[in-house]
């Protein structure tokens, strides 16, 4: 990621085709040593490409990656129907859980395990 960021920084700074020397200079300015193999890989992949197009393609690829929230949303409607009939029981369980939590917090007498 550091090599891509340095390449983009050089390209956005006006250098349309940054070399390995340019990127090493950027990395050295913040105290990062460059790995020549990775650096050459980034340069070979990005050399000659329009940076704005590369960023737009990356955003498109990230948008197609599924997010973790979609699974929970799809499961909720199927489980909502059975839960509607047992709402009072669920409320009682929640009250019991709250009581148990308060008892557990008193067990340590206000002191945490690692304090």
Curated annotation (Swiss-Prot):
Residues 78-115 are annotated as: Disordered. The modification N-acetylmethionine is found at residue 1. Residues 78-90 have a biased composition (Low complexity). GO terms for cellular component: cytoplasm; cytosol; cytosolic large ribosomal subunit; extracellular exosome; focal adhesion; membrane. InterPro entries: P1/P2_N_sf, Ribosomal_P1/P2, Ribosomal_P2. Plays an important role in the elongation step of protein synthesis. This is Large ribosomal subunit protein P2. The gene is RPLP2.
């Amino acid at each position: 990621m550091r090599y891509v960021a340095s390449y983009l920084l050089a390209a956005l700074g006006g250098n349309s085709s940054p070399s390995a020397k340019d990127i090493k200079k950027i990395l050295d300015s913040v105290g990062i040593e460059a790995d020549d193999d990775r650096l050459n890989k980034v340069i070979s992949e990005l050399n000659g490409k329009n940076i704005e197009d590369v960023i737009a393609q990356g955003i498109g690829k990230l948008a197609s990656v599924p997010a973790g929230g979609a699974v929970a949303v799809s499961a909720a409607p199927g489980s909502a129907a059975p839960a509607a009939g047992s709402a009072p029981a669920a409320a009682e369980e929640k009250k019991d859980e709250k009581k148990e939590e308060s008892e557990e917090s008193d067990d340590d007498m206000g002191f945490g395990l690692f304090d």
